[in-house]
UniProtKB/Swiss-Prot annotation:
Role according to the record: Mediates the deactivation of rap1 and plays an important role in spatially and temporally regulating cell adhesion and chemotaxis by controlling attachment disassembly in the leading edge through the regulation of myosin II assembly and disassembly. Overexpression leads to defective chemotaxis.
GO molecular function per UniProt: GTPase activator activity; GTPase regulator activity
Protein name listed in UniProt: RapA guanosine triphosphatase-activating protein 1
Subcellular location: Cytoplasm; Cytoplasm, Cell cortex
PROSITE patterns documented for this protein: RAPGAP
Biased amino acid composition, Low complexity: 262-292, 442-455, 469-482, 603-622, 943-966
Highest taxon in the source lineage: Eukaryota
Keyword check for Cytoplasm: yes
Keyword Membrane: no
Major localization listed first in the record, in broad terms: cytoplasm
Gene designation per UniProt: rapgap1
Compositionally biased region (Polar residues): 483-494
Keyword terms of this UniProt record: Cytoplasm, GTPase activation
Length: 1055
């Protein structure tokens, strides 16, 4: 197992998690002489004590009966250090030992996390007592604990369902205090939610390394109480002032731990048990030391003075005089002991009392509902895996670059601005040339440093980056650039983790995942809060910069210019944002620099501006692949010379197949306009603090507008959704560098400046905070109504000699067996009474629209068929009003036609809603001269639906029984049992052409029933979506959108 290193404070202080043994210089002194010592820089004290019994009552007695061994650690040479790493890489433990330690650590965590949750709940109760500025100052340490815990658990996901607490009457009229109370209430909920989710994750996890990562986070959370002197709130630990002494103590097993040696589980507090588990296993060496060096460790509790005794077999290789089996080694920071003094007593609470107090703690369950707990565990597993693979060596390169930049900014701001301006001018001048800059240009503005960093090359054995950086970079395999789709995300299984290139050492950690599925109830907007702070979430890291650069220049930059550091893959959310949100300039093109210092020709200046705009357009949106041959054929409908089933008539188009198409490409059955099926507002805005604005055009009062804006921390951008009467527009704006705070008014000014021509005459007002919750729910419903993922298709039965009278088609109540077989291809027969899924307007209570219907769940869509013969109709009703009430409001009609005497005339359909007509007819198979049946197209495609295969077999058997006498049995012709269909598509002329295309006179076989279903549903869904884009429906949708927006302005935008 490799050892990771952490950079503590600066790059010249490196601390290993487990320091290798080194020669010691032991000096025995008494405790009374401690105050007169001056501690060297590389100085450590070793206190050798005997195991303390419960009768030990004071720290003073412990120190007086102890001997102090001062240890001067000799610095290790690089060769010695590399040998130590190689030795520890070969250390392994048996699977049984690892399983035992995992079980032990899991039990300790399950005992510790509820105590932390109870402590946070107690903090929430104390925060509720704040009623004025003085009481807020008194509770400052309690509030700081909440902030520190939130920072510790920032990367972990939270639950959903947050509700703001009511404001007490004694703070009404104090907006700052109200906002403060809301922030603290949200922190209490968020910390409890994350701790509860971690507890749930620990219950289902036995991976020791993952448990260690979570244990370190829990240790840091406990340190938040200790550092702010609020340890009395954690009742399960019974802290006292002894922590001020123990705050400088770190327990290390300097004794050589043999692989596979069992470590007895101590029967002390869960804190000391957790510390022993975290520090005694070689598995924990894979954790970065930056995670284990957070001030006071979880070892620093009152019971940590009692170290579990090691077996005597582990004392032989210690290299010191400590040979007794009951000896314990405690490394003490002498300066901390001298500063704090030995003045407190150690808590001697019995173990039974501790367990009793732990059992009394209430179990706090996760705030996330049960149906999303599995996805929540996956998010936690992603965070833990990222922490395990994080390497400080890679990030230290960027840290040095950032330090140089900040140093230059502090020393000479004027020079800093001049160099920045010079670089920007150089980029504009070279905008017509390929990009040759790399990440160093954005981070280091010092010319010398930039030149040095630009010349970094890949080295197989590692090389020094510069004189101030001690971290080395390793060679990365170029094949890692190609990441397969199945490896684009993290998986919880160890095999996926090992095989995935994302977990290779060349990759940095990705940005933290978002919370579980968003809830409309979680608003996250404190009442009265007008500003959004960015500084607390923008800690610089290499992966943040790499993500931003990859998003902006992924088609133009080569990532090999930064040595061996590769940019991490974009998260799925960032990819979706990059694909759907158009990048805008922070200032309009007309407001470009009007002052020209150098008399350059106006033509040259305009050319540079045009090149810059073209570059921005190409880099802001991913390039779309060119349409395939099949997609081009979808838009080419040939005029039928002789239509098979549909009678050509005025006002209608017919597609009976394309002569240029050779076969149906089932791999490219693409549904149109799927980019409009995403819930952008619900996914990107609802779970974050955001602002909403409403207004109308001053010159055109009938033109309303609604704007939502949120801050995207990962990319340091503002995301906008602009809703007008016509459509939703999605944009993103980059925030200026160094912008620490931005108000809602500034957000609105930025988008108005970028979209000046569109928004110059709009008067927009922010939705009030007390109405924002209800308004967000309205926006979620508004977005859901504009997403079209449920369909209702009508099905008519056309018997022989029918097709010229609409009432004849609607009056058919008895059907043939072939029609029933065709219905089984369309979907499943379901009972309507008690139906819980999409019902398509049918009655599911009283069976007034029939007892059964046909339903299909296909991809992400739901289809309910309105089968006319299955809907009850009175015999005396010649118009079949009950059936027309449903089928007449369907855009798509499927007509199953029998016989060849008459063609279907689409002009007989009187409904204005029916626009798409799919006529399907059964045809007899035509055998070849060789004696083989018609080519079965399904043989070249995989059909994985076993149930459909069984249904097809049953259908074939029924056909054998019913039509054996009609099959040819002479002339050596084979018996053919497959049923074949031919399809013709018709639509009104105002509907644009749609696909997928199919060959002329193509025959679909029942042996490929699922493929026939895929083709037919794709064609019909595309037809309905194309119809909604037609002028008639587009005008209705536009009018409906405007009515909704005007109602929002009336209800939420008034004074």
């Amino acid at each position: 197992m490799s050892i990771y290193h952490g950079i503590i404070g600066s790059s010249d202080h490196i601390q290993n998690i487990f320091p290798p043994p080194s020669p010691r210089k032991n000096i025995s002194l008494s405790t009374n002489n401690i105050s007169s010592l001056t501690t060297p820089k590389n100085f450590t004290a070793i206190v050798v004590t005997k195991p303390l019994s419960q009768s030990t009552t004071s720290t003073q007695e412990m120190m007086n009966t102890s001997d102090i061994l001062f240890d001067i650690q000799q610095p290790l040479s690089p060769q010695h250090h590399s040998r130590q790493i190689q030795q520890q890489q070969h250390e392994k433990i048996t699977p049984e030992e690892e399983e035992r330690r995992s079980d032990e650590l899991q039990k300790i965590l399950l005992d510790t996390i509820p105590i932390l949750i109870k402590g946070v709940e107690t903090l929430g109760i104390e925060v509720e007592q704040i009623c004025n500025g003085d009481s807020a100052n008194e509770k400052r340490s309690n509030c700081q604990v909440l902030v520190d815990i939130q920072k510790t658990l920032r990367e972990y996901p939270r639950g959903m369902g947050y509700r703001s607490k009511t404001i007490p009457s004694n703070i009404v009229g104090k907006p700052k205090l109200i906002a403060f109370r809301h922030s603290m209430d949200q922190l209490v909920w968020e910390n409890i939610s994350k701790l509860s989710i971690l507890k749930d994750f620990v219950e289902f996890t036995l991976d020791f390394q993952k448990l260690c990562v979570i244990g370190i986070s829990i240790r840091d959370a406990i340190n938040s109480f200790v550092n702010n002197k609020c340890e009395y709130l954690i009742k399960g630990f019974e802290f006292n002032n002894t922590n001020s002494i123990l705050s400088g103590i770190n327990i290390h097993h300097h004794l050589n731990h043999q692989p596979g040696a069992s470590t007895p589980r101590p029967s002390h507090s869960s804190s000391s048990s957790l510390s022993h588990s975290l520090s005694s296993s070689p598995m924990s060496q894979s954790l970065p030391s930056s995670l284990t060096s957070g001030g006071v460790s979880l070892l620093n509790t009152s019971d940590d003075a009692i170290v579990p005794s090691l077996s005597s077999g582990n004392d032989d290789s210690s290299g010191s005089s400590l040979s007794s089996s009951d000896a314990n080694v405690i490394s003490i920071n002498i300066s901390t002991v001298i500063q704090n003094g030995v003045r407190d007593e150690i808590n001697n609470t019995s173990i039974s009392a501790l367990k009793k107090s732990q059992k009394q703690q209430p179990v706090v369950l996760s705030r996330a509902p049960k149906q999303v707990m599995e996805s929540t565990r996956i998010l936690v597993d992603t965070v833990v895996n990222r922490k395990c693979m994080y390497r400080e060596e890679k990030a230290s390169i960027y840290r040095e670059m950032m330090n140089d930049r900040l140093t230059l900014l502090k020393e000479d701001p004027k020079k800093f601005k001049q160099q920045l301006l010079q670089q920007r001018r150089q980029k504009l001048t070279n905008s017509d040339q390929p990009h040759e800059t790399d990440y160093n240009e954005d981070f280091n503005l010092n010319n010398n440093s930039t030149n040095n960093n630009n010349n970094i090359k890949k080295e197989s054995n590692g090389s020094s980056v510069n004189s101030q950086t001690t971290t080395t970079t390793t060679t990365t395999n170029n094949n890692n650039n190609n990441i397969s789709p199945q490896h684009s995300g993290t998986s919880g299984s160890p095999s996926d983790k090992e095989n995935s290139p994302i977990f290779s050492p060349g990759y940095l950690s990705t940005s933290p995942p978002k919370s579980p599925p968003k809830s409309p109830e979680f608003l996250g907007v404190p009442i009265g809060k007008k500003a959004h702070l960015l500084g607390h979430a923008r800690s610089f890291s290499a992966d943040t910069h790499a993500t931003k650069e990859a998003a902006a220049n992924q088609h133009h930059h080569s990532h090999n210019n930064i040595g061996s550091v590769l940019s991490p893959p974009l998260s799925s959310q960032n990819e979706r944002i990059l694909r759907n949100y158009k990048l805008l300039s922070s200032s309009p093109s007309s407001s470009s620099s009007a002052v020209v210092t150098n008399p350059v020709s106006l033509t040259t200046q305009l050319q540079q501006q045009q090149q810059q705009q073209q570059q921005q357009q190409t880099t802001s949106q991913p390039t779309q692949p060119p349409p395939s041959e099949y997609q081009l054929l979808d838009l080419e409908w040939e005029e039928p010379i002789d239509s098979d089933f549909i009678l050509p008539c005025k006002g209608y188009k017919i597609d009976s197949g394309n002569s240029k198409c050779q076969q149906v490409n089932y791999d490219e059955l693409i549904v149109l306009y799927t980019d409009e099926d995403e819930y952008h507002y619900c996914d990107d805005f609802c779970s974050l603090e955001h602002f909403n604005f409403l207004g109308v055009n001053k010159n055109q009062p009938d033109n309303p507008m609604c704007i939502s804006v949120v801050v995207q921390h990962d990319t340091n951008e503002l995301l906008y959704i602009i809703r007008t009467g016509e459509k939703d527009e999605k944009y993103r704006l980059s925030l200026p560098y160094g912008k620490k705070e931005i108000s809602s008014k500034d957000m609105l000014k930025m988008i108005k400046k970028s979209r000046f021509n569109q928004m110059s005459n709009f008067k927009l007002k922010e939705v009030k905070s007390d109405q924002n919750q209800q308004f967000i729910k309205q926006l979620i419903q508004f977005e859901a109504k504009n997403i079209h993922k449920t369909f209702k298709f009508g099905v008519l039965y056309c018997s022989e000699n029918q097709g010229t009278d609409e009432n004849e088609l609607y009056s058919n109540s008895s059907t043939s067996d072939e029609f029933q077989e065709f219905l089984r291809i369309l979907g499943d027969r379901v009972q309507l009474q008690g139906w819980t899924k999409y019902r398509g307007g049918l009655d599911i209570k009283d069976n007034t629209t029939g007892t059964h219907s046909i339903y299909k769940k296909w991809r992400d869509f739901e289809i309910m068929y309105h089968v006319a013969p299955m809907i009850p109709c009175r015999a005396a009703d010649e118009q079949s009003v009950e059936r027309k009430r449903h089928l007449g409001n369907d855009i798509v009609l499927i007509i199953y036609k029998e016989g060849n005497t008459k063609l279907f005339d689409p002009s007989i359909i009187k409904s204005n809603f029916n626009h798409i007509f799919a006529v399907v007819q059964k045809v007899d198979p035509i055998p070849n001269v060789d004696g083989a049946a018609v080519i079965n197209l399904g043989n070249s495609f995989n059909n994985n639906n076993s149930s459909n295969n069984n249904n097809n077999n049953n259908n074939n058997n029924n056909n054998n029984n019913n039509s054996d006498s009609n099959l040819p049995t002479t002339n050596n012709l084979p018996i053919i049992t497959n049923v074949n269909y031919k399809i013709s598509i018709g639509c009104k002329e105002e509907v644009q052409n749609f696909g997928p295309a199919f060959p002329k006179n193509h025959i679909f076989s029942t042996s490929t029933g699922e493929n026939l279903t895929d083709f037919l549903l794709t064609r019909l869904i595309n037809g309905e979506r194309a119809t909604l884009k037609s002028p008639v429906f587009a005008q209705k949708l536009k009018r409906t959108r405007k009515e909704f927006l005007h109602s929002f302005i009336t209800d939420f935008g008034s004074e």
